[in-house]
Design a protein with these regions (language model features):
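N-terminal glycine-rich FAD/FM-binding segment characteristic of electron-transfer flavoproteins
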Residues: 1-151
């Protein structure tokens, strides 16, 4: 089982939200791929390759990825995740991740699961509701789950 983590970065290093998403992805077991998208993102890809649990770093580098537009990145993530290549697609629960994951989920024709705080098993998560006052279990039988993960 493979998991795809979409990296948020500052063109030099991975954001802490992405590091948290990588840690959460390790709960799925299996291999973890990190997708680094941008313009001139060699340093980020090198940093991602040193993170524990990361199996493979996928780098997509082009001028039109330079501004980090969610629509461009979502289309790329959809092409990678379609066809059963990944069990889950994760991003950190930052503004980057919350902007991106609904688009990826829509392109994959699945429902996103936001603000996950615990991964119990593939397809079984915990997330807060009511302004964080209640933690609820969420179960998914979708072919691929698209998640934002709180660190």
């Amino acid at each position: 089982m493979r998991t795809l983590v979409i990296a948020e970065h500052d063109k030099a290093r991975l954001a802490s939200a992405t590091l948290g998403a990588i840690t959460a992805a390790s709960r799925f077991g299996g291999e973890i791929d990190v997708l680094v998208v941008g313009d001139a993102c060699d340093a980020v890809a090198a940093h991602a390759s040193t993170v524990q649990s990361v199996t493979r770093v996928l780098k997509a580098e082009a001028p039109y990825y330079g501004d980090g537009t969610a629509e461009n990145i979502a289309a790329l993530a959809q092409r990678l995740a379609s066809g059963g290549a990944y069990r889950a697609v994760l991003a950190g629960a930052s503004s980057f991740g919350k902007n991106l994951t609904p688009r990826v989920a829509a392109l994959l024709d699945v429902a996103p699961v936001s603000d996950v705080i615990a991964i119990e098993a593939p397809g079984r998560y915990r997330r807060p509701i009511y302004a964080g006052n209640v933690i609820v279990p969420v179960e998914s039988d979708q072919p691929v789950d698209v998640l934002t993960v709180r660190a």
